[in-house]
Structures are given as structure tokens and as C-alpha cells.
Amino acid sequence: VHRRRAPNRSETPVLLPDQVNTILDGCSVQSPSGEWTGSEAGLRDRLFFAVLAETGMRIGEALSLRHNDFHITGGETPSILVAGRDDHPHGVRAKSGARRIYIGDDLVALYSEYVWQLIGWAADVAVADLASHFVFVNLARGQRYAPLRPETVYDKVDALTAAHADVLPQDWTPHWLRHTHATALLLSGVPEHVVMRRLGHADVQTTLSIYGWVTADAEMRTVAQWNSFVAGWKVSHDSTP
């Protein structure tokens, strides 16, 4: 992991692509037969961290997502609409205003697998209106299909860290995936104003004040194949919802 060099406190902690993949695979992997490994919550957890990595969302924004925020049909570029909600029962909220984030085919396929898993468990019967219900819900404990608590996410972070102590930093948090998203895009040559829009920043200066250092850091440019990491993402200049 690349950490800020003291005494400079302006650099953000970043996960390397291999570390992100360790997080995803540590949740669940798909077997050759198409089955997903791990617990019932494994696929949900993989989707959650994949959403953070590919979209740069904050944890509150991801936990606040509804199924009808995923726009993956109709022939248009697949996207997720991030709405400025504050109605999550566990107090998390989307800090930024509404924006549309375009996503790649792999994330679309992962989300679709998760939805089919929910339907296979009759979630569409148990929940009055699944389309408007929260995407990330309880599966392993608590009231089934109730909105997921942030504490559950952090419990998973702790479990992944313990299981992969040789790969993952001991102090990583879900927010590091947001930093990684921005870093990967900037080092892949994506314009700063596009990164700004995907992150939901009010102006490009905010983006530059947080992440401007990465483009001038020679080590960060060579420490990973950033272009390959973002190759499947759909990055668009149009962020209008």
C-alpha cells in the first residue's frame, strides 16, 4: 500500500489493484459451475466493495442505494444514479448531490447475479416493492432484507483484514476504495473534471486539493498497471442525472 510520507499530510491512503482484488475475492468467487463461494452474504459483500471501487462512492451513498437506482437496461450505457438521500434507518446518508455514475459490464453482471440470488430466496415476495428497496440488506443476521448497517460492513473489513493480513493494510477502511478510484482514474489520464463529477465534488479544486499529488508522484505511476485496472470502467464526461 502507498501511504503518505511524513510530514506531508496531504496524500491519501491508496490500495493497489491486487489488494482490491484480494478484498473482492475474499468475499466470494464464482466457481466454474457458476456457484458463488462463501456465506449467503458473500456475493452481497463482493458487490458492495466492487461498487465502492468502481464508482468512488462513499459508504453512506452505497448503503443508501435502491434497486431502481441501477439503470442497466434499455440500450443506454449502464449507470447508477446517486441520490442525495438521508432516509437510511441507520443514519448513513449521501453527502453529495445527485449524480449519475457510468459502470462497466462486469459490475452490471455482478449486480444481476446478486438480484437473481435475492429472487431465488423470494426476496421479491418478502419485500413489498423490491425495486424501490435498499440494494444492500441483511442476509446473515438481523431482520432479513432490512437495510444493512454500516457496522456490518466494518465487521467484514475486520474479517478480511484478519484473513489476509499478509496483503491488506491493518488500518484500511471502505473509504480507501474511494481514494483508490480517484487515484486510478487520474493516473490513467482521465481529466480532472471528470473525476470531480464521479466523486460528487462541488468543484475541481476540491478534487485537486485531495488528489493532485498523485499525478506528480513518479512512484505511484509505476507501482501498478492503473490503465489495466480501470479498463472495464465506463467513464463519461456527462454526469447529468
Which positions does each model-derived feature cover?
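Basic, Lys/Arg- and aromatic-enriched nucleic-acid-binding interface segment
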Residues: D18, T22-I59
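Conserved tyrosine-mediated DNA breakage-rejoining catalytic core shared by Y-recombinases
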Residues: S28, S64-Y111, I119, A123-D124
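Short, basic (Lys/Arg/His-rich) helix/loop patches that form interaction surfaces
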Residues: S33-E35, Q143, Y154-R197, H201
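A short, glycine-centered helix-capping/turn motif at helix boundaries
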Residues: V51-S64, S188-V190, H201
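Catalytic-site neighborhood detector that most strongly recognizes the C-terminal catalytic loop/helix
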Residues: L199-Q225
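C-terminal secondary-structure termini that scaffold catalytic or DNA-interacting sites
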Residues: W226-P241
